[in-house]
Swiss-Prot record:
Its EC number is 7.2.1.1. Pfam families: Rnf-Nqr (PF02508). Coiled coil: none annotated. GO terms for cellular component: Gram-negative-bacterium-type cell wall; plasma membrane. One of its GO terms (biological process) is sodium ion transport. InterPro entries: NqrDE/RnfAE, NqrDE/RnfAE_oxidrdctase, NqrE. Belongs to the NqrDE/RnfAE family. HAMAP family: NqrE. This is Na(+)-translocating NADH-quinone reductase subunit E. NQR complex catalyzes the reduction of ubiquinone-1 to ubiquinol by two successive reactions, coupled with the transport of Na(+) ions from the cytoplasm to the periplasm. NqrA to NqrE are probably involved in the second step, the conversion of ubisemiquinone to ubiquinol.
Length: 198
């Protein structure tokens, strides 16, 4: 149990997808103007990562890995396209659920909801799972923790950006300029966790 708690804390803080690996930056910067919208997208990313990483773990382990289906056959060259297909299917299902049950959130996310399909954080989570050879339980914990970490980062950035509306930002830095500086400072803050040994 201690191993899984360690993996969860590590994936949220020490190896944060947004602030340590800078994955998923396009939606991270574009949707982080309001806390409510950022929280909605963060929840969507948590759901997709929590499901996509373990599902792709099963696909990789039982279909693509060497000797998985047939002895002597290695289908790992199909990994990327298979992972993207699974992620795309999960995002489509999530999009239909949000459209049906949460129309305001669906409309607020707009084009960024389908873009979760090609969000680097989602694909990065799946790729790290394969690279680190996580088992199914570890991949569930890692997917959930990575999603929570990404959501934490985007909601924190949105809160800071909402407060900065009332700040006296120099004209040359207004908009994305000050946002990049803010993200850099947040990343420095998260770097302080890098020395933590779990």
């Amino acid at each position: 149990m201690e191993h899984y708690i360690s993996l969860l804390v590590k994936s949220i803080f020490i190896e944060n997808m947004a602030l340590s690996f800078f994955l998923g930056m396009c939606t991270f910067l574009a949707v982080s103007k309001k806390v409510k919208t950022s929280f909605g997208l963060g929840v969507a990313v948590v759901v997709v990562l929590t499901i996509a990483v373990p599902v792709n773990n099963l696909v990789y382990t039982y279909l693509l890995k060497e000797n998985a289906l047939v002895a002597g056959v290695d289908l790992t060259f199909l990994s990327f396209i298979t992972f993207i297909g699974v992620i795309a299917a999960l995002v489509q299902i999530l999009e239909m659920i949000l459209d049906r049950f949460f129309p305001p959130l669906y409309n607020a996310l707009g084009i960024f909801l389908p873009l979760i399909t090609v969000n680097c954080a989602i694909f990065g989570g799946v790729s790290f799972m394969v690279q680190r050879d996580y088992n199914f339980a570890e991949s569930v914990v890692y997917g959930f923790g990575s999603g929570i970490g990404w959501m934490l980062a985007i909601v924190a950035l949105a809160g800071i950006r909402e407060k900065m509306k009332y700040s006296d930002v120099p004209p040359g830095l207004r908009g994305l300029g000050i946002t990049f500086i803010t993200v850099g400072l947040m990343a420095l803050g998260f770097m302080s966790f890098s020395g933590v040994q779990l």
